[in-house]
């Protein structure tokens, strides 16, 4: 995620800046491609010579987002296609079909006509589970800017993932009734219930997802809305921790998304 926010996206914004010489921009494009793409490509291809099913969503998604962002910056259709194909059909937890480990009715009845989607890392800890919200948000938004609506993919499954995650993390209390499908991880064994480790983790990303689904698509997203409002104004994450890797500032960027 940092590669997109710290290198690819700023470079994309500055590509027409008259103070950045064309030859220097071309050097930068070659540098970001040569430096970061091979690592991400190798990881998604063979997961550093380990089993794809022993990985995590939060490992695959940053590599996918990096490749997609480099593809956009360099007008490289092959890389864009590679990242999107992994989202659709990849062999790893970044594949949307692999990311979802259970579909559940909302015990509280607030999510109507839809399901809560249990993500792969909900049984691991909430630091990583909430990290995936932002990763999905930025990946989908990058594709959306190119006219590819991943937010809507598979009947808006990304929203269902976010609603499950938001519902559990709205408070630090542990008395939240959460349906859970047991999930077996080849290295760590069975996950029998939602992990309370890091519960209530406040990472950026909620403003983008909530405002897109609620304002652009006109959909009901009660738990994502509550989480976005709880954290508003969305800043730059918790400085000094891993959250500082998120771009953040979602309230500033996306609160008026309906007008964009």
Label every model-predicted segment:
Residues 1-5, 258-260:
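Conserved small/polar residues in nucleotide/adenosyl-binding loops
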Residues 4-146:
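Aromatic-lined, polymer-binding surfaces characteristic
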Residues 150-257:
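CBM-like carbohydrate-recognition segments
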